[in-house]
């Protein structure tokens, strides 16, 4: 019997609030409410949207970024905490899967973190960007493979990667082997210019084709006033314009709605889940089109820990702490990520 599910998804392209602490969270909640009025069941926000992506690190040297870096620490998200509680409540209220990018603060370090909340408000996945890109390495620490999981939500199997993680084919394959149905990708947007938008489009359409899944991609947006607040240099301001490609793509690599390349807005489309089988019938890259006896992937999915107590084996230590590290604590209700 064919898959009868049709899931309405939304990808959001809006600007953060640089001025008011908590302002970006208000924008997240308002967008969730708006999406609910459109019948949306899954919504994706841009990379590290709360409180904002560290654009300053792209156009300023580290020696001139200390105050802005400290401000980001002060507004960063503790998981679990007030931000996750607010988003959890909104997800539960509207029975919506919410995929949110945050700057996570874990004691003295910041991380580029993706959070997935299920339709009952439970946080079902917390993962950290494996390797921050270029300028980002001055801002965030590194994630590990413990978060390379697909979450089984109330509507579909959901996976997520951030920005140039999509250029790591092994990271993408790790999610593909768990049979993700909806891939949620996040990019900063308002960066590099039109060439970045073109690269994003190629990337997300290729992943949709290769994995045989839907891709819901969200990029951020900066207003002219916000760009001018980051840098007064006209040449550097050019580096903070363009680069937006908020879009929803089918398993056949087709846009399901007109993508958003500039300005604020929301791309909404219906995902006919039967298209997954239609694609994989022809090419299942982790099934009948795979050759695991020739090519296979090894993953060290143990959480990276600075201390392993001698009172327990390394394997035992990894098993004991993995759920907390993946989902970010016990305050939010949890579901088990998909194992395979």
From Swiss-Prot:
pH profile of the protein: Optimum pH is 6.0-8.0. Activities drop at pH values below 5.5 and above 9.0.
Keyword Calcium among UniProt keywords: no
Reactions that this protein is recorded to catalyse: a nitrile + 2 H2O = a carboxylate + NH4(+); phenylpropanonitrile + 2 H2O = 3-phenylpropanoate + NH4(+); an aliphatic nitrile + 2 H2O = a carboxylate + NH4(+)
Keywords assigned by UniProt, alphabetized: Hydrolase
Temperature dependence: Optimum temperature is 40-50 degrees Celsius. Displays high thermostability with 90% of remaining activity after 2 days at 30 degrees Celsius and a half-life of 18 hours at 60 degrees Celsius.
Biotechnology: Nitphym exhibits high stability at 30-50 degrees Celsius and broad substrate spectrum, and emerges as a promising candidate for industrial hydrolysis of nitriles. Immobilization of Nitphym in a packed-bed reactor enables the biotransformation of 3-cyanopyridine into nicotinic acid (also known as niacin or vitamin B3) in a continuous mode.
InterPro entries assigned: C-N_Hydrolase (IPR003010), C-N_Hydrolase_sf (IPR036526), Nitrilase (IPR023919), Nitrilase/CN_hydratase_CS (IPR000132), Nitrilases_CHs (IPR044149)
CDD domains: nitrilases_CHs (cd07564)
Superkingdom of source: Bacteria
Ranges of residues in domain CN hydrolase: 7-273
Alphabetized Gene3D superfamilies for the sequence: Carbon-nitrogen hydrolase (3.60.110.10)
A GO MF term: nitrilase activity
Known regulation of activity: Highly resistant to various miscible cosolvents and tolerates high substrate concentrations.
Database matches in Pfam families: CN_hydrolase (PF00795)
Active-site positions on this chain: 47, 129, 163
Enzyme Commission number(s): 3.5.5.1
Function: Catalyzes the hydrolysis of a broad range of nitriles to yield their corresponding carboxylic acid and ammonia. In vitro, shows high activity toward benzylic/unsaturated nitriles. The preferred substrate is trans-cinnamonitrile, followed by mono/di-cyanopyridines and aromatic substituted nitriles, with a moderate activity toward 3-phenylpropionitrile. Shows weaker activity toward the common dinitrile fumaronitrile. Also shows weak activity toward some aliphatic nitriles, including adiponitrile and glutaronitrile, and the arylacetonitrile 2-thiopheneacetonitrile.
Subunit text: Forms oligomers.
UniProt family annotation: Belongs to the carbon-nitrogen hydrolase superfamily. Nitrilase family.
Stated name of the protein: Nitrilase
Species of the source: Paraburkholderia phymatum (strain DSM 17167 / CIP 108236 / LMG 21445 / STM815)
């Amino acid at each position: 019997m064919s898959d009868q599910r049709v899931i309405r998804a939304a990808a959001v392209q809006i600007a953060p609030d640089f001025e008011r602490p908590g302002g970006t969270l208000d924008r997240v909640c308002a967008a969730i409410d708006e999406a609910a009025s459109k019948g949306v069941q899954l919504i994706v926000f841009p990379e590290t949207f709360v409180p904002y992506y560290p654009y300053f690190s792209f156009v300023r040297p580290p020696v001139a970024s200390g105050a802005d870096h400290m401000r980001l620490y002060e507004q960063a998200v503790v998981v679990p905490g007030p931000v996750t509680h607010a988003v959890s409540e909104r997800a539960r209220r509207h029975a919506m899967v919410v995929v949110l990018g945050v700057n996570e603060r874990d004691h003295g370090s910041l991380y580029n973190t993706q959070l997935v909340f299920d339709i009952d408000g439970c946080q079902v996945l917390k993962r950290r960007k494996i390797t921050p890109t270029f300028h980002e390495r001055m801002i965030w620490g590194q994630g590990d493979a413990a978060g390379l999981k697909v979450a089984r939500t109330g509507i579909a199997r959901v996976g997520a990667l951030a920005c140039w993680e999509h250029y790591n084919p092994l990271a993408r394959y790790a999610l593909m082997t768990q049979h993700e149905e909806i891939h949620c990708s996040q990019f900063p947007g308002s960066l590099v210019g039109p060439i970045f938008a073109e690269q994003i489009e190629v990337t997300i359409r290729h992943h949709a084709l290769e994995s045989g899944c839907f891709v819901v991609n969200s990029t951020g947006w900066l207003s002219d006033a916000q760009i001018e607040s980051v840098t007064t240099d006209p040449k550097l301001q050019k580096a903070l314009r363009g680069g937006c490609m908020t879009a929803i793509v089918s398993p056949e690599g087709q846009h399901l709605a007109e993508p958003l390349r500039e300005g604020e807005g929301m791309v909404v489309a219906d995902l006919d889940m039967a298209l997954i089988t239609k694609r994989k019938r022809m090419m299942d890259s982790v099934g009948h089109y795979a050759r695991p006896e020739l090519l296979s992937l090894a993953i060290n999915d143990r959480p990276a820990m600075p201390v392993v107590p001698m009172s327990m084996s390394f394997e035992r230590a990894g098993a004991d702490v993995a759920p907390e590290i993946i989902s970010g604590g016990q305050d939010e209700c949890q579901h088990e990520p998909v194992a395979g």
